[in-house]
Curated annotation (Swiss-Prot):
Job description of the protein: Regulates ADAM17 protease, a sheddase of the epidermal growth factor (EGF) receptor ligands and TNF, thereby plays a role in sleep, cell survival, proliferation, migration and inflammation. Does not exhibit any protease activity on its own.
Gene: rhbdf1
Annotated GO MF terms: growth factor binding
SUPFAM superfamilies from the UniProt entry: Rhomboid-like
Lumenal side: 435-661, 715-716, 770-774, 827-857
Glycosylated residues, chain numbering: 585
Organism: Danio rerio
Aminoacyl-tRNA synthetase keyword on record: no
Name of protein: Inactive rhomboid protein 1
């Protein structure tokens, strides 16, 4: 080996020109000397607001990395209690670990920029001040180099700080980057440009914006049509991002001792950027004009891009192209001059492009905007903006926020639409209008004659089922959720009248009916009353005092039989339903041998029972009981309420109607209003807070609103998520309050939002709109938003304040909910003047159907 090395050296010396002289000093290293690692030179990071560079450095040592790796293996694992405690603190946003908190705070501030108007000037200015993650000015002002081919590796590198103002290459609008063209220097590369291109992009993970559900569905359908696997396409797809953080970490490590100061060449751009307003492309999608410029300029790429970059060599050197400083998007009012941008695609030597691009219409279809904290959709409608100066810490919190996918919004909207369609298809549509609908017809009554009867039904202007059908489906209705005193007294009065009734048998034996003595004709019929009538049976040797009952007698019923010790009581209201009689056709008992013309029928929604004919019961849309003979043998409230049977037939217990009614709607129009609200306001807020927080606020606000409505409007069937929607509106106020310090005109935004909510409350004073659910849902949603809706913090003191705030508002909400439960179940109240909060009687009959002293039919 030594001889071969000596031969090669001698051959090289023979080829060396006589005029070339190389003096290479020999390095002498002793045996005991430990080789020292030379730390990399610190690179100067330039900020906008600083005239002098700030030095930041990294020191890397292989030995220290090995030691740190070994130490990490012996770290003690945290206990389960600490893990649960830390996870709970992270979920509420009060953890000591600043990563999760800062991520949420950055997202919150970004969301604020689209909802509540312009920010204060100092806030926007502070957002543009240097922070720990801003990209260095050198990397933004120095053009990137062209890649040096392998055949030219031996040539010298040239530092070219004046390489500006040359031709540009075009970047696709998907990436949105604008980078100046590198001057073409044959066989050379700019060292300053090379390190500038590596400044921030190599160390920051290129996180791409999450795709929408529609875009993923479109890609999956395309993969199925082409016969390819969706996973294969996902793995083959390169990692990209649709936006770039507003700053990068300014710590660069270079491999050479010299460093250039380019702040002089960036002075004009710094002055121009300081005068610009805060309008970031992070919050917006690319405009149509920009997309068209991209397509029109792709034809001239070959003349501007220079030589193509070899893909394998480019990956080896980890060359990444920097961003144009600021990556601002010009407002539509003042169109910017056209720029020729650098194409960020990695191109092979033969000129082929990597991957394919979706067409312009598809790009526009799937373009998604990120929701800035404090602004959002409502902020766009009210022209809300940030201040001009925002603290860099607050700005960092906004940038770290990611939009959540509105899974809960899509799920609840799908459920609402599906249930509404099924309800309309099964129960039909009630008469449409705002008044009462009357139907008159001639119907066979219980006395065997035809009579003109009238059926009154409440109209439904929402184009949906009737109130009785909505109660069957699970509407909020107090008599089905507790034992209502008025309904219970009505049933007791009916039982008292029935206890003193008897069977009225016509003289011609053509029919019989259970009535009182006043309703039985003394000339055409006989009122078989015990013990005056000779057909009275005995009970323990004593004549029975109550009876008789048409088609039911203890002596003729065999199942259940009236035998000792299970004899039927003297009180006929406690008699059971007889399911089997004696087979004899003639018993010589007038109330048994007659033809019965009326049986119990449950009519209305208040538990009213009548013994009438089947024809009349069907006309009144009641529930006819063919098997019973007395109203005391049936439970009308069980028929009216439906759903699961009561545990105790005399005590309604369907408390689950408080949240079941949130999924129902009064009609098609009602469902459309909810869908519009949820796909705009609810979807926008869920992007900010996530499905779990929004679902908690949505459901708990709706339950609280329904509970208050059940207290003050007990006899009115209510459906729909009115309380939930006003609880979501309360989230807008909480978000505005938390973003107060960064808004330019917070009082103006508050006034606009307050006017909208007051208008909705005033709209609730009209008939068929429950204002009690609106008010209670708004108050509960306000408390829950302070507890469950995290926000940006402005220091350590603000974090401690939030911890106290979470506890206080949770306690207040629990106290409010407990108070409503006590008023509903323990101490029911009857408020006479409360009806003015839900309906103002402009005329005598305007609020008749909403009277809290409901008429019990």
């Amino acid at each position: 080996m030594a001889e071969l090395r000596r031969d090669s050296t001698s051959s090289l010396q023979r080829k060396k020109p006589p005029w070339l002289k190389l003096d290479i000093p020999t390095a002498h290293v002793s045996v005991d000397e430990v080789p020292a690692f030379v730390p990399p030179v610190k690179r100067q990071g330039f900020h906008r607001s600083a005239s002098m560079p700030v030095e930041t450095s990294h020191f890397h040592s292989p030995q220290r990395d090995i030691i740190d790796h070994r130490r990490a293996a012996f770290q003690r694992q945290s206990s389960i209690t600490q893990t649960i405690k830390r996870g709970t603190a992270d979920w509420f946003g009060v953890s000591k670990d600043g990563d999760a908190t800062q991520k949420w705070q950055r997202k919150s501030l970004r969301h604020c920029s689209l909802r509540y108007g312009k920010l204060k000037p100092q806030v926007i200015r502070e957002m543009e001040l240097p922070s720990q993650d801003n990209i260095s000015l050198t990397s933004t002002e120095t053009p990137p180099p062209l890649y040096v081919p392998s055949s030219q590796h031996g040539m010298q590198k040239i530092v070219d700080p004046l390489a500006r103002g040359r031709a540009f290459r075009m970047v696709e609008e998907v990436d949105g980057y604008s980078v100046p063209q590198t001057p073409i220097t044959p066989g050379a590369a700019s060292i300053c440009s090379f390190n500038s291109s590596r400044s921030g992009l190599n160390r920051i993970p290129r996180r791409r914006k999450r795709e929408s559900v529609a875009k993923m569905s479109f890609r999956a359908a395309a993969a199925l049509v082409k016969g390819r696997s969706l996973r294969e396409g996902t793995l083959r797809r390169a990692h990209r991002r649709s936006f770039t953080p507003a700053s990068f970490i300014e710590e660069d490590v270079v491999d050479f001792p010299d460093e250039l100061d380019t702040s002089f060449f960036a002075r004009d751009i710094m002055m121009h950027e300081e005068m610009s307003t805060f309008h970031d492309e992070v919050f917006e999608s690319p405009s149509d004009s920009t997309m068209k410029d991209v397509d029109s300029k792709q034809l001239d790429e070959s003349e501007l891009t220079g030589s193509a970059l070899d893909k394998s060599e480019l990956e080896k050197s980890h060359l990444m192209l920097p961003l144009e400083r600021g990556w601002r998007k010009v407002k539509e009012k003042t169109p910017a001059p056209p720029k020729i941008r650098l194409k960020q695609e990695v191109v092979s030597v033969n000129g082929q492009r990597r991957g394919q691009r979706i067409g312009l219409p598809v790009k526009k279809l799937f373009a998604r905007e990120k929701r800035p904290y404090g602004l959002g959709m409502v902020g766009k409608l009210t022209n809300r903006t940030y201040r001009k100066r925002i603290d860099s810490y607050v700005k960092k919190q906004i940038e770290d926020m990611d939009d959540h996918r509105p899974f809960f919004t899509y799920w609840i909207t799908f459920v609402h639409i599906l249930i509404t369609i099924l309800a309309v298809c099964i129960y039909g549509i009630a008469p449409v209008g705002f008044s009462q609908h009357e139907t008159v017809d001639s119907v066979l009554r219980n006395k065997g004659v035809y009579e003109n009867v009238k059926f009154v039904q409440q109209e439904n202007f929402w184009i949906g089922p009737s109130s009785e059908a909505l109660i069957h489906l699970g509407a909020k209705f107090s008599p089905c959720m507790r034992r209502d005193n008025q309904v219970h007294e009505l049933i007791k009065k009916k039982q008292e009248l029935e206890r003193n009734s008897a069977c009225c048998v016509r003289n011609d034996r053509s029919g019989c009916l259970q009535t009182s003595e006043e309703e039985c004709s003394s000339t055409l019929a006989v009122w078989v009353k015990w013990p005056q009538h000779p057909s009275v049976p005995q009970l323990d040797g004593v004549a029975r005092q109550h009876g008789s009952v048409c088609h039911q007698d203890p002596r003729t019923c065999t199942e259940p039989a009236s035998v000792s010790p299970h004899e039927w009581p003297d009180d006929i209201t406690k008699w059971p339903i007889c399911t089997k009689y004696n087979s004899g056709n003639h018993t010589n008992l007038p109330h048994i041998d007659c033809t019965i013309t009326g049986r119990p029928c449950c009519i209305g929604t208040k538990g009213r029972c009548e013994i009438t004919s089947r024809e009349y019961c069907d006309f009144m849309k009641g529930y006819f009981h063919e098997e019973a003979t007395l109203c005391s043998q049936v439970h009308c409230m069980d028929d009216v309420c439906g759903l699961l049977p009561f545990l105790n037939p005399e005590v309604p217990d369907q408390f689950y109607r408080l949240w079941l009614s949130l999924f129902l709607h009064a009609g098609i129009l009602h469902c459309l209003v909810s869908v519009c609200f949820q796909m705009t306001i609810l979807r926008d807020l869920e992007k900010l807070a996530g499905w779990l927080r929004i679902s908690i606020i949505y459901i708990l606000s709706g339950i609280t609103g329904n509970l208050a409505s059940a207290i003050f409007l007990p006899y009115r069937a209510e459906v729909g998520p009115a309380g939930s929607q006003f609880g979501i509106l309360a989230c807008l106020f909480v978000e505005l309050i938390q973003s107060w310090q960064i808004l330019a005109q917070p009082w103006r935004a508050f006034t606009k939002l307050l006017c909208v909510v007051l208008f909705l409350f005033a709209f609730g004073l009209l008939p068929w709109i429950d204002n009690f659910a609106h008010i209670s849902g708004f108050i509960s949603g306000f408390f829950l938003s302070f507890a469950f809706l995290p926000y940006i913090s402005f220091g350590r003191l603000d974090m401690y304040r939030k911890r106290c705030q979470i506890i206080i508002f949770l306690v207040v909400f629990l106290g409010l909910f407990a108070g409503l439960v006590v008023l509903f179940y323990v101490h029911p109240i009857k408020c006479e003047w409360c009806e003015l909060l839900t309906c103002i009687p402009f005329t005598d009959k305007f609020c008749e159907k909403y009277d809290l002293n409901a008429h019990l039919h």
